[in-house]
Amino acid sequence: MNTNHRRIKINVSWKWGLFFFLMSVAFSSCIDDFDVKKLQDTPRLVLYCFPTEGDTTLIVVTKSLPVSSFKGDIDTQSRLPVDASVVYKVNGMPQEVKRIENIKEAQSFSQVSDSWFLSTLIGQYYAVGKQKAGDKIEVQVSADGLSEVSASTSIPEKVDVNIGDIHLKEKSSDHDVYFSVDKLEATFSDPASTTDYYSVKVTRKQKYGNLKGVPKEGNRWQYDVYANNYQDYLNYLGREDEYEWCFDSLASNIVWPEMVTTSEPLINKKSELDDDFGFDEYKYFDDVYIFNDRTINGQTYTMHLEVNSNDSYWHTYDGWDRLFGFTYNVQLCKVTPEYYRFLKSINDAQSNSWADAGLMQVTPTYSNVKGGFGVVAGFNVCEASKYIAPLPSAPSDNQGGIYTK
């Protein structure tokens, strides 16, 4: 499956909906995740929609293809949009639904300029209308020759999250992990009156690219120079009388570092039984870590999150974080039960080494779409960030730093 979208930067109001559009594309050809018996009859509509607070909601409509009789490139054909009538309601009131007509319009949904990525958006739909936490969302889709489908969800209240201490380049709590980790504390308060579902993700924003040096007036070397990495920049130090450094020539990038789950009980799914049989540990799709409040209901709880240090500032993107620092971001997403069940079914399927060995049945991907496939599921995200100033020099593997509240 194509997961090259993992580092795409997306406009805030659509970023999670667009992320799940890409996820639906990635899974559109993975027929083992669905009920194969249903896929063997006539084509059915496939609907994906992930409403949240804001004024624009992406609606993805494709169709399933009968695996027993279809001839051709099923992977490509299953990604194509469908000419359909789409009704989107907020608290029973229909909202305006538009269609993405061209690359230029698709570009408004993303800062990504990749033509293939943008082409996957053409022909899809989006609803325009303000919506907030507590709103009920209904989606109905009909198309010629296909049965009508419908689904409903709601937008949950967001839960605030705060970043506490951050410890850099420490030994992981998992004895099987050979790399150093950065340890983050993230605190939130779970509502006591409801059963709640969440996802958490850690990202890191950092500089990358070539640093441009422009000759000062009178410099006999009349051409620009470029520091390709932090070491190159150090080599130019001492020549400040010759060059002006254009620090805005560097771009910012967002990465999703690998997370070690054993330090946090809410997301730790590592099984000693799996270890005994040599099976892989639990896999979270696209580094979105889901959990529920069964063990923490009504509590103010601090998550202890570990991410791979070696994905980051001392090795990745040429070491510019030694000069500029970087920013950690924690995204805590309050999700609806259908959102949680959908992601959990994907995680369970891709983590089921017992099924791969023929010892257990594969569970189909969850769907709440009546008459078809896919999912309509609401969410609400809260983010917290903490800037990490550059250390004077690169620490060794047993030398780290702590950034307090």
Summary of predicted features, one role per range:
Residues 13-20:
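Sec-dependent signal peptide recognition
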Residues 26-29:
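C-terminal motif of bacterial Sec signal peptides marking the signal peptidase cleavage site
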Residues 31-405:
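A sequence/structural signal for flexible, mid-protein segments enriched
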Residues 1-12:
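N-terminal secretory signal peptides that target proteins for export/translocation
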